């Protein structure tokens, strides 16, 4: 039942309720549901500016739930956002390009990765054009 609460809260943009439901789910879930709960743990940590703890969760997904490619791919996008938040745009760009190249079967993931990549490249172009000699 917790997964239904969590997913409906995400769909209705009730992130506080979703965060709570996914935290409860994380304690009891196995397999793909555990990967999903961990993804949202990383997602919420990223939104709170907790970039390094978020990356630790993404690494756990990669290590323990590598068979669940969809949440693995989505969590890599969170990792890229974390690296951008940590001022490492090179690493962020590399991860996003890798997601776009390697997860073509997930069109929603590709679109999200491309959108994030375009944003980062746009921000970097602004930053670089403001540098004067």
Where would I find each of the regions flagged by the language model?
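Acidic, polar-rich low-complexity tracts and alpha-helical solenoid repeat scaffolds
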Residues: 1-133
């Amino acid at each position: 039942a917790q997964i239904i609460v969590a997913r409906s809260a995400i769909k209705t943009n009730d992130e506080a309720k979703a965060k709570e439901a996914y935290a409860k789910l994380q304690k009891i879930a196995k397999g793909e549901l555990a990967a999903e709960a961990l993804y949202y743990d990383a997602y919420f940590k990223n939104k709170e500016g907790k970039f390094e703890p978020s990356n630790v969760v993404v690494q756990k997904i990669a290590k323990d739930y590598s068979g669940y490619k969809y949440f693995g791919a989505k969590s890599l996008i969170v990792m890229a956002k974390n690296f951008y938040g940590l001022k490492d745009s090179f690493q962020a760009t590399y991860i996003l390009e890798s997601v776009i190249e390697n997860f073509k079967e997930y069109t929603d993931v590709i679109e999200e990765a491309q959108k994030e990549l375009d944003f980062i490249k746009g921000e970097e172009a602004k930053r670089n054009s403001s540098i004067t000699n």
